[in-house]
């Protein structure tokens, strides 16, 4: 049961169209989830959001979009790994403790989604300027909203 030469071009065309549709659809879904996570994170005011993080977004002029996403995921992972059990972040009350756990959960989700969007195995992160986690997340949200508007076109 071989394919005739007349069937091959339409099959390749359908395959290419399906791939482009799936890529655009996945881009749309992933970005929407990232933006929703960033909205939740930036609304939270916890003790940890005032701590500093390596601001790779300030020094991302000569990097590709994928490298920027990869580096953002890397610094977020470094941040939440270091501060997950940090007593400065845990707070004194049960409510502060709950907010901190929620913050870490959202940062892990954001990390996972950024890695998926980047599609890279690893990326180097050079020491750059520092900013608060709150400012970093706001800038990342702006970048993601711009990408989302381009993805929808």
From Swiss-Prot:
GO terms for molecular function: cytokine activity; growth factor activity; interleukin-4 receptor binding. SUPFAM superfamilies: 4-helical cytokines. The keyword Chloroplast does not apply. One of its GO terms (cellular component) is extracellular space. Disulfide bonds join 27-151, 48-89, 70-123. SMART domains: IL4_13. Its main location: secreted. InterPro entries: 4_helix_cytokine-like_core (IPR009079), IL-4 (IPR002354), IL-4/IL-13 (IPR001325), IL-4/IL-13_CS (IPR018096). One of its GO terms (biological process) is positive regulation of DNA-templated transcription. Glycans are attached at residue 62. Keywords: B-cell activation, Cytokine, Disulfide bond, Glycoprotein, Growth factor, Secreted, Signal. Residues 1-24 form the signal peptide. Pfam families: IL4. Participates in at least several B-cell activation processes as well as of other cell types. It is a costimulator of DNA-synthesis. It induces the expression of class II MHC molecules on resting B-cells. It enhances both secretion and cell surface expression of IgE and IgG1. It also regulates the expression of the low affinity Fc receptor for IgE (CD23) on both lymphocytes and monocytes. Positively regulates IL31RA expression in macrophages. Stimulates autophagy in dendritic cells by interfering with mTORC1 signaling and through the induction of RUFY4. Belongs to the IL-4/IL-13 family. This is Interleukin-4.
């Amino acid at each position: 049961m071989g394919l005739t030469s007349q069937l091959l071009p339409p099959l390749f065309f359908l395959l290419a169209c399906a791939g482009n549709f799936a890529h655009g659809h996945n881009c749309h879904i992933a970005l929407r989830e990232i933006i929703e996570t960033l909205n939740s994170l930036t609304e939270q005011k916890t003790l940890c959001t005032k701590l500093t993080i390596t601001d790779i977004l300030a020094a991302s002029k000569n990097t590709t979009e994928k490298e920027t996403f990869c580096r953002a995921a890397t610094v977020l992972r470094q941040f939440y790994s270091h501060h997950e059990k940090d007593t400065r972040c845990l707070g004194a009350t049960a409510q502060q403790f709950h907010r901190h756990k929620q913050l870490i959960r959202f940062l892990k989700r954001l990390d996972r989604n950024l890695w998926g969007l980047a599609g890279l195995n690893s990326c180097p992160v050079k020491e750059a300027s520092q900013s608060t986690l709150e400012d970093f997340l706001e800038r990342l949200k702006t970048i993601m909203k711009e990408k989302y508007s381009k993805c929808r076109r």
